[in-house]
């Protein structure tokens, strides 16, 4: 006679084991209709699963994230159902959920086309609209294997053979004639799976191993209702317009080419943005009392073996040989900073030492993962390492957190997700060291009143880390900043200081980056601003144009006055109509367009327009100079006249 405790604290007693769905029905017909699954004592269960003992129960509906994740997982099975009907010889591999959607890896003897995706999507909708029930059957390991052997599904058999214990009882989900295997839960009926879209096909190796067969990965998105799907697809369209690769080409910021995969060729305008970011961060380094250093690009293998990078990070390191010595190009800056710390005796009175570098790093990322500026092989980190005592950890981490929020707010990022990544399986150092490091970061977050999500096993091999992810205007998340606590690396490289009792102690090292990769951060803000950079970042801050040749000298005078004041200003004296010039520079997203006609010359003024078409009227040269200098100096996000 199970007693079921509901979220409001009320209890219901039943005479016999009862399913999640039947409990929902006992509460109300509306809840039963909305029930996708249940959370029994915190564990997700199918709506058909029986509750046999006293339990806490929450009904999962499409209104919550868990419900949406289950809908997406069931849409992956629906895709399997449809593709088996259209391509009976296809072999099914895996079909998990991902952020905003799902995918299914399939083995098919021909490449899928856009026409195939359209046909699959149509068949999925036809099947879903029959609103068939999804039937769950828990079977023995052998029965599951026999089922997939009879159906000619080698990948499912491999999963059973390699990943599932023979004593286990796998769940098979029946979608009419189609059968799939899954931990679940899944929707009880396909009426929940009407709002989806297949997005693309890509290649993917079985088990993610390049030695295995290349499969075809079909990506899809799924939502709880038509409105959510429509809004998501609209966001995707907007994201495509904002793609930093397109904007980067249109604005002539940078390019990449096959001869240097994952390496950026910065053009003048892109490099201007890069240098402005460096200048901005440098002002903050001074404000937060950092010293700036520069370490070598390449160091001997012996050093990387001492740090543990060679053993734990070797696959991502570029190496070279010279004069019978093996070197690695640095993937990160920390070992070099320890070498600088080690020069000269340090006392506890010298600590904390905050050491910053715009470090040029290289990582041998897989070619398939490279993506514009977002995933590169050569990048610059706004990196810093703080050498401190254990007593200083909390105050130093707190200062790092303050600096992170200070810098992000300048770019208009206010929605920041905080995550604490704990010890990975592959790591250096004793568990006691990791306990202290994780507790230290958690305490700093709590004392600063920050809510955070724990990411088990996602820390660096040498220490746990706080990650700061930016949520952009399209609701996408970008991981940028990190604060990592490291009790291991300084000791491995013999770093020490003289403590108050005259004993030698090993300093704690705090690794911190805020922008992260500057290349990636430029990609992020390019998409966030859609190329409409604020005036302080814009490569050209104002363009000065004449209407006829007679105004050329005045234009040059205006340009010289503004340029001499340190502003980035150009002239456009071409023999073109003024409307043509305005359209061209609007497309180039130049913040301000200054038009000089005879009336403006007579009054000693300029007519000012913004790139979004606002006519701001006329200003004297000195008035406009003061306005633009103030915007640049205070790093304002909006132009004059913008809300």
Curated annotation (Swiss-Prot):
Co-factor note (free text): Binds 1 zinc ion per subunit.
A GO CC annotation given for this chain: cytosol
Entry EC no(s): 6.1.1.3
Cofactors demanded by this protein: Zn(2+)
Domain annotation TGS: ranges: 1-61
Catalytic activity: tRNA(Thr) + L-threonine + ATP = L-threonyl-tRNA(Thr) + AMP + diphosphate + H(+)
InterPro entries: aa-tRNA-synt_IIb, aa-tRNA-synth_II, aa-tRNA-synth_II/BPL/LPL, Anticodon-bd, Anticodon-bd_dom_sf, Beta-grasp_dom_sf, TGS, TGS-like
Pfam families in UniProt: HGTP_anticodon (PF03129), TGS (PF02824), tRNA-synt_2b (PF00587), tRNA_SAD (PF07973)
Classification via SUPFAM superfamilies: Class II aaRS ABD-related, Class II aaRS and biotin synthetases, TGS-like, ThrRS/AlaRS common domain
Binding site for Zn(2+): 334, 385, 511
Single GO MF descriptor: tRNA binding
Subcellular location(s) of the protein: Cytoplasm
Cross-referenced PROSITE patterns: AA_TRNA_LIGASE_II, TGS
GO biological process, any: threonyl-tRNA aminoacylation
HAMAP family (alphabetical): Thr_tRNA_synth (MF_00184)
PANTHER family hit by this protein: THREONINE--TRNA LIGASE, CHLOROPLASTIC_MITOCHONDRIAL 2, THREONINE-TRNA LIGASE
Known function: Catalyzes the attachment of threonine to tRNA(Thr) in a two-step reaction: L-threonine is first activated by ATP to form Thr-AMP and then transferred to the acceptor end of tRNA(Thr). Also edits incorrectly charged L-seryl-tRNA(Thr).
Protein name: Threonine--tRNA ligase
Annotated source species: Pasteurella multocida (strain Pm70)
